[in-house]
Amino acid sequence: MSKEVLKPEHLSKVLQRNDPQQVTDRTFFIDGSNQSLETIPSEILALKELEELHLENNQIAEIPPDIQNLKNVRVLYLHKNNLQCLWPELASLSSLESLDLSSNPLLYSSLTVVSCLRTLRELRLYNTGLREVPTVICKSLHHLELFGLSENHLQSLPGEIVNQTKLREIYLKKNEFSVFPCDLCTLVSLEVIDLDHNKLKAIPEEIGNLVRLQKFYVASNHLSLLPESLSQCSKLSVLDLTHNLLHILPPTLDQLTELTEVGLSENRLEKVPRLLCRWTQLQLLYLRNTCLRGLRRSFKRLINLRFLDLSQNHIDHFPVQICALKNLEILALDDNKLPPTMSSLTKLKILGLTGNDFPSFPEEIFSLVSLEKLYIGQDQGCKISYVPENIKKLKNLKELYIENNLVEQLPASLGLMPNLEVLDCRHNLLKQLPDAICLAQDLKELLLEDNLLTHLPENLDHLVNLKVLTLKKNPIEDPPMEVCAQGKDAIWKYLKENRIRKQMAIKIQAWWRGTMVRKGYGSYEELLKARKKGKTSPKDKKGKKAAKGKPAKRK
């Protein structure tokens, strides 16, 4: 096997990142990720004291035999490479506790080597094309605490999985399970189960055996019912049931009093389950597109909520219960039919109101002094035609989205918003931008597609932090379209040169004025009036030239 594949510049990059003065035989950590490496550098394999080695996202196709020198390595990350085979020498890593081989085209047969790593606590095999889990791994590795198998083609787990008595986390997301792997219910140490994006139709009653379960992810499956025994998982803090076929929840689930995050979006609930209002420790609640028409009065008990998503429902009035949620930081009410009623939620940082029926800009939001992001684009719903000057009251606002409306002009006060970073005005009727926009020095993105702009403010290039400027579908004349098509840098250059030309013109005009006045031709104002009326200058009044061959007449 060649040891000369490594290019010198790659090694220098690795050493430079890890401080070459500190890279010695006593080095404990090396980060060689994202370096286009084709093999593991021999210089790294000589670091016998190395404990943690990151080589992810390279082009490594094989592991050199000298890997066996790294007797002390405890963490080895090799995900996102081109590994197919694992050589027996890998089994010599007697201290290895965490191994990541994800996103490699591994041959199934080569995984036998992994079963020899008896000290492993974490094994990640995401996206490796697995159709079944090697039985030998489940038989031999008795200390696994984390097993990552997401993004494969698994339909079941081997019965030997029951040997993983220390397993705390198992990740099976994006596989092909149509039946819940019941053997998991015997692993009483489990704290995290992720079965998102499978084809599960039911969860067994035995799930109640997992009394230590803290996080349970079963989003994007075909679940129509939940077992009542789930209530025995009393330590559950996260329950994600998003995008299933649920209409109701078992009333016994009100015993899950430690829940802090619940996902129920994309189900057909039609009304908020009564028991939900008893989960008073909830901080994040997702109820998007659940056919809700309102909230229960008891909803106001959820005083610890920080995030609430009620978007894409059938709510036609502002739920006053929300006003009791004083800790709310993010509120999504997009695509409902809300009037502009809003109450003071002093900690609210993100507010989504897209697709609602506002006859005008809802000025009630100006009391939300902590607001950092405001979404009021109206791809559907009643479109607004103006943004009030009082938008400046939102001193902490960083991102303002007003796309898909009928706004004809922007308030000059936008230039007085010291934290504004993103301004999305796409698909409106803007004819010009206020000059004051050039004062919004923190602006990083200015999105102006599909408006009626014919020119840009001459000082727009003063926005030194601007990274993104979009101007497509505008009848731009100044700068010319060919300049705009070249991007922001070309526009900035044009604006600067245009200013210089104007300054020169002003200087020349001032010089001409001074010259005319000094020569006694009258004041500048008189000269200008005479010129406009088409009269001759004072100089021409001193005498007229005679016709050719004739003396001029004297007066």
List PLM regions with ranges.
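The feature captures the LRR N-terminal capping module
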Residues: 1-413, 419-422, 435, 458, ...
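Calmodulin-binding IQ motif helices
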Residues: 508-509
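Repeat-solenoid scaffold signature
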Residues: 442-444, 448-466
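Short amphipathic alpha-helical linker/capping segments at the junctions of internal repeats
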Residues: 522-536
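Short, flexible/disordered secondary-structure transition segments
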Residues: 455, 460, 477, 518-523
